[in-house]
């Protein structure tokens, strides 16, 4: 029941995620990593949690949650973890050490992805932004508003700026999605820009 698995639904999106990103700075005032906290919708959460219940005790045990986190991390690698980071308009790769943890909160599956950048970015010197989206639009990822974004160890004068995107359409047919460009879903993804005025 990985996040990229198909389900028998005729229209996109199939899964909904509420995202709460954290921007992690290092001691040099550079952005070193992103931490993406994803809360899955009730239907997918139920489906995924029942699918990992190997011992049939109707409880998501720590080892079962860890197994699902590993499966999702492996599956998301080819999709760049549904997270596009840009430095001066150029795509930035993630580095080694990507990891994930799962917990259950009020019945909802919550996955936290730890995404270290291949090279830290100094947002005082470079324009940096990121957005989260599934290019296949199988999954709709939303960042509620600016309050959902946080920064950790940010230097004085550095903050995350939230820019709303266009309202994402619902019930897009599979046949339509299959003929869309890879960048189509990006237009519905809120963009987070890191501004440093200090």
Name these PLM-found stretches.
Residues 22-23, 84, 129:
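Residue-level detector of beta-strand face positions
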Residues 43-119:
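Structured domain cores in non-transmembrane regions
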């Amino acid at each position: 029941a990985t996040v990229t698995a198909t389900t028998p639904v005729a229209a996109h999106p199939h899964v909904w995620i509420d995202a709460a990103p954290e921007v992690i700075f290092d001691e040099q005032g550079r952005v070193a990593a992103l931490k993406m906290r994803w809360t899955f919708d009730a239907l997918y959460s139920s489906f995924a949690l029942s699918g990992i219940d190997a011992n049939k005790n109707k409880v998501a045990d720590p080892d079962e949650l860890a197994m699902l986190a590993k499966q999702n991390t492996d599956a998301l690698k080819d999709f760049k973890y549904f997270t596009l980071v840009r430095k001066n308009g150029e795509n930035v790769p993630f580095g080694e050490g990507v990891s994930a943890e799962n917990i259950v909160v009020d019945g909802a599956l919550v996955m936290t992805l730890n995404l270290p950048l291949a090279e830290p970015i100094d947002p005082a010197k470079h324009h940096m932004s990121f957005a989260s989206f599934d290019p296949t639009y199988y999954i709709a990822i939303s960042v509620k508003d600016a309050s959902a974004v946080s920064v950790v160890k940010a230097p004085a004068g550095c903050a995350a700026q939230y820019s709303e995107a266009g309202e994402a359409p619902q019930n897009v047919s599979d046949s339509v999605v299959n003929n869309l460009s890879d960048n189509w879903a990006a237009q519905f993804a809120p963009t987070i820009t890191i501004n440093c005025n200090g």
